[in-house]
């Protein structure tokens, strides 16, 4: 089973559109992932101007559909001390460390397109990119 991070979800939706929804069955995301994916789309639209406002809205609706089909893991389900320990020892954000801790605790493969996160995560859990799923 898979745990998708925001970078993977955003890239899957941009590349595959609604076809990305097929990847959701029995898989997971963190409850904060929607906010992160929305922020990534905002960055692509408002700051980098790589997509239009209309494209960002369409992608956001697909992201919401994608997340609505995934099993969401809340912060209350993850060992907070483990997250903080990873964040401090590996110099990752608390957000990024939460993906590793959740994948570790639930024995999931972490799907991420964040190279820095993947490099650290591969010492703890199986990892894949969105191109590999």
Residues covered by each model-derived region:
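Active-site neighborhoods of divalent-metal-dependent phosphate/nucleic-acid chemistry enzymes
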Residues: 68-116
């Amino acid at each position: 089973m898979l745990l998708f991070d925001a970078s993977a979800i955003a890239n899957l939706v941009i590349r595959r559109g609604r076809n990305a929804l097929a990847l959701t069955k029995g898989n997971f995301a963190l409850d904060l992932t929607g906010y992160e994916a929305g922020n990534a789309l905002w960055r692509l639209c408002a700051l980098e101007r790589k997509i239009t406002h209309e494209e960002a809205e369409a992608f956001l609706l697909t992201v919401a559909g994608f997340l609505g089909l995934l099993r969401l893991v809340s912060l209350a389900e993850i060992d907070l001390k483990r997250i903080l320990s990873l964040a401090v020892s590996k110099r990752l954000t608390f957000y990024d460390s939460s993906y590793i801790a959740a994948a570790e605790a639930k024995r999931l493969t972490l799907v991420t397109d964040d190279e820095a996160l993947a490099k650290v995560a591969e010492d703890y859990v199986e990892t894949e990119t969105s191109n590999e799923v």
